[in-house]
């Protein structure tokens, strides 16, 4: 996956401190049981999506994975984003900190987010997105449409 560099870490929800369990720069994926993928859209949308995913995960015995895609401009090296990784980690820890249980947080530095999602999501992955709905498609709604075209079942958690 030359389009992106993954940075993986595990965050115990309910604990705003983020502790990197694993930071990798390879495409290796640990084998896990059934997982629900939450893709970051906005703070409010992601918070809503995490609530929905956590409710589903409790009933299904699934792991919740929060995926944050950061598009690095072509003018910068992929290994040197404009935003620091510690800042992104703290931001995601703050989002995840209000939920019980555990979530796996993955930060991907990429050039093209949709291409990175196509490469990293296993076939038919259950995806939860959050965001507002309007009569014109929002960014989150367009992402929902693209993921459905790639064959992923998508649950849209609407913010109010």
Model-derived regions: residue spans:
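Membrane-proximal amphipathic alpha-helices
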Residues: 138-139
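Structural beta-alpha unit
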Residues: 1-30, 99-127, 134, 143-154
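Glycine-rich, N-terminal phosphate-binding loop of Rossmann-like dinucleotide-binding domains
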Residues: 40, 131-132
């Amino acid at each position: 996956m030359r389009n992106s560099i993954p940075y993986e870490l595990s965050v115990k929800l309910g604990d705003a401190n983020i502790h990197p369990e694993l930071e990798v720069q390879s495409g290796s994926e640990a084998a896990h049981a059934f997982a629900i993928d939450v893709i970051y859209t906005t703070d409010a949308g992601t918070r809503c999506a995490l609530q929905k995913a956590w409710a589903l995960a409790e009933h299904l015995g699934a792991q919740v994975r929060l995926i944050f895609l950061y598009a690095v401009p072509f003018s910068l090296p992929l290994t040197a984003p404009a935003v620091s990784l510690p800042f992104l980690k703290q931001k995601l820890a703050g989002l995840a900190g209000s939920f019980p249980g555990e979530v796996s947080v993955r930060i991907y530095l990429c050039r093209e987010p949709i291409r990175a999602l196509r490469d990293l999501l296993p076939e038919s992955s259950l995806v939860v997105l959050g965001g507002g709905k309007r009569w014109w498609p929002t960014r989150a709604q367009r992402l929902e449409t693209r993921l459905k075209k790639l064959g992923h079942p998508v649950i849209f958690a609407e913010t109010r």
